[in-house]
Amino acid sequence: MFDHKAPGMRVDLPATALAFTDLHNDFLSQSGKAYPLIEESLKKNNTADNIERLLRAAKAVGMHVFLSPHYYYPHDHQWTQPLTPLEDLAHKIGLLDRKGAFTLEGLEGSGADFPERYKPYLTDGKTIVTSPHKGYSTSTNDVILQLRRYRIEKIILAGPVGNLCVEAHLRDFIEQGFEIAMVRDATAGTTNEEGDGYQAALVNWRFMAHALWTTAEAIRLIKASANSEQRNVAA
């Protein structure tokens, strides 16, 4: 059995950021197309509320917040290469669909839009909303570049689909040299005939992440980092 202690992660401002994947209605709102797939896990973890708590805490101390969204445009539905099972489902049900890359027509209130409760945090002119990822990982958007440009070295990571986009981002971030702390109750997952995706994510994160926190632990450390930064400035 693997019982080696994780190294942990110190939260340092301004080198630490809070990052999310997929904060969309289709995952987090009851009317969302994928909501039924992860509903049980979302409710058990209190995921939607915990995401807002993290956003509020980060904004209160001036921590950088990054969001890696996921959108599909009409040209994405013209792909000819075979899709993965989840991509195939997404295309069939219109998950995260937008009218196009250069228009906001139909976005407001749609499945691709942000939940209203998060908009004060995500549209404040300070949150870094990257270009959309098209698969699961960071390989199809600019989130790595954006993190580098802001001199981010450590990431507190969360999002609604823990065993897919969140974990894919985790793996990429680690291989790009970032330190990562995962927030275990600010995420969720679905099940299939092979087992529980959320539990599978936790198992993998325990092997890979530098730290695995609850939302309460993450908020405590975020607040403590701000106090430490203030003391350093005063000194």
What feature does the model see in each segment?
Residues S68-Y71, P160-V161:
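Short, well-ordered beta-to-alpha junction loops that form the rim of enzyme active sites
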Residues P14-T16, G32-A58, G62-P69:
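A short alpha/beta connector and helix-capping loop motif
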Residues M1-A17, D26-F27, A60-V61, Q78, ...:
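Active-site-adjacent betaalpha module
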Residues Y73-H77:
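Short catalytic/ligand-binding loop motif for oxyanion handling, primarily in non-cytosolic enzymes
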Residues T21-D22:
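N-terminal nucleotide-binding beta1-loop-alpha1 segment
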